[in-house]
Design a protein with these regions (language model features):
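An N-terminal, well-structured beta->alpha segment
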Residues: 1-63, 69-70, 151-176
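Gly/Ser/Thr-rich active-site loops/lids in small-molecule metabolic enzymes
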Residues: 200-205, 210-212, 265-284, 322, ...
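Gly/Ser/Thr-enriched, mixed-charge loops and adjacent short helices
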Residues: 109-242
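N-terminal small/polar loop signature for handling phosphorylated ligands or for N-terminal nucleophile
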Residues: 45-109, 195-260
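Phosphate-binding and adjacent anionic-ligand microenvironments
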Residues: 246, 286-393
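Glycine-rich phosphate-binding loop
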Residues: 94-108, 113, 239-261, 265-266, ...
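Short glycine-rich phosphate-binding loop at a beta-alpha junction
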Residues: 43-51, 178-180, 292-298, 335
Length: 393
């Protein structure tokens, strides 16, 4: 049997490959063992979850077995969004992984890794060392298991995650809003009823119209990548048909959120960045922070730094890349960061990105005033976007 070449699936910030071709259970078991050995996690808790892709559950089990064999205490979190992993790593101060290929097609799966406190594992912080050690284990066999490996346990963090998000943005007193949510058959189909609905907590003044909430890693309706305009069409149509105030679209692992206004038009992520930045600056100033820092990446609209400065904050421009941005968030003590790709980072969320918390800020801003979203969004994006051109070199 040919040994998999892990260089095909290990990227700069995560692991992604085609199931059965560049990633399989044997490889995942070796990666689990290497994760513990490289990061020095013997005797420590390791949190393990995954999305709705068919391979995520067996991959999580295989990773747990590999981690346990090297002395870690694996805890299976079950089906989770990626930001649930970051929450759990922050809350329990433990390292963890989640199996997801985010918005990639159904044939793919992958791994996003974090250290204790939700600090990302990337090529700069051990990811390639994990790859190399795991490659050795695949070629030569796993080391002998530790004596008395820990029992693999289970934990559901959805209720704690939902309660924590609600503690950061109070939606209980906003005006009633009609909200269409397109989960794209991804993990937002699990998290939305818990956070915004009344599945686990008290009801909010939100009338939610669900679109593709059934968890299905084959993505039968459309790819779970709202960055592509074609994948927003169903949501845009539904918002108009329902006469909704707002539409929300999440990607497959629900760490990114895109917004549609009442007319069915997509709202620029730069406008969302500016809107949330204003709210976070005001909150930080109310808590006594003199000049709150806001992170924005290279391709956000210039409206973002202009608004931040006008509101008494300090904008810091960074290059693209979630691991890099999280590091800058921590270094600068930034209260919030936004990317034009609709990744939104919060100091109060362990410097990690969470689409759901960003969505809650938008709902709060909309529901705390009487105007429509299209007019509100125009305040935050006064410039015409030029779009992006991606070139391979």
């Amino acid at each position: 049997m040919t040994t998999l070449d892990l260089t095909a699936s290990f990227k700069a910030y995560d692991v992604r490959g085609i199931v059965g071709e560049t990633i399989n259970e044997e490889a995942v078991r070796a990666i689990g063992a290497a994760f513990v050995d490289v990061l020095g996690l013997s005797g420590e808790t390791v949190l393990i979850g995954g999305d709705m892709r068919p391979s995520s559950v067996p991959f999580a089990q295989a990773f747990a077995e590999g981690a346990a064999s090297r002395g870690a205490k694996p805890v299976l979190l079950g089906l989770i969004s990626t930001d649930e992993l970051y929450f759990a790593c922050g809350k329990f101060n433990a390292a963890g992984v989640t199996f997801t290929a985010s918005h990639n097609p159904a044939a793919y799966n992958g791994i996003k890794m974090a250290m204790a406190g939700a600090v990302p594992v990337s090529s700069d912080t051990g990811l390639f060392e994990i790859r190399d050690v795991a490659q050795g284990y695949l070629q030569d066999g796993l080391p002998a298991s530790v004596e008395n490996p820990a029992t693999i346990t289970e934990l559901d963090v959805l209720a704690d995650y939902s309660d924590y998000l609600r503690s950061l943005v109070d939606l209980s007193a906003i005006r009633p809003l009609k909200v269409v949510v397109d989960a794209g058959n991804g993990m937002a189909g699990l998290t939305t009823p818990a956070v915004l609905g009344d599945q686990l907590l008290s009801a909010l003044p939100l009338d939610i119209a669900p679109l593709f909430f059934e968890l299905d890693g084959t993505f039968p309706n459309h790819p779970a990548n709202p960055l592509e305009p074609a994948n927003l069409v169903d949501l845009q149509r539904a918002v108009v048909e329902h006469g909704a105030d707002i539409g929300l679209a999440f990607d497959g692992d629900a760490d990114r959120c895109f917004v549609v206004d009442e007319l069915g038009n997509a709202v620029s992520p730069s406008a969302i960045t500016a809107l949330v930045a204003r709210r976070e600056i005001a909150r930080a100033k109310a808590a006594g922070e003199e000049t709150p820092v806001i992170i924005h990446n290279l391709i956000t609209s210039r409206a973002v730094p202009e608004l931040v400065e006008a509101d008494g904050g300090r904008p810091v421009r960074t290059r693209v890349g979630h691991s890099f941005i999280k590091a800058v968030m921590a270094k600068e003590g930034a209260v919030f960061g936004g990317e034009h790709s609709a990744h939104y980072y919060f100091r109060d969320f362990f410097n990690a990105d969470t689409g759901m918390l960003a969505a809650m800020h938008v709902l709060a801003a909309l529901g705390e005033q009487d105007g429509v979203l299209s007019e509100l969004a125009d305040e935050y994006e006064p410039y015409s976007p030029s779009g992006e051109i991606n070139s391979e070199v």
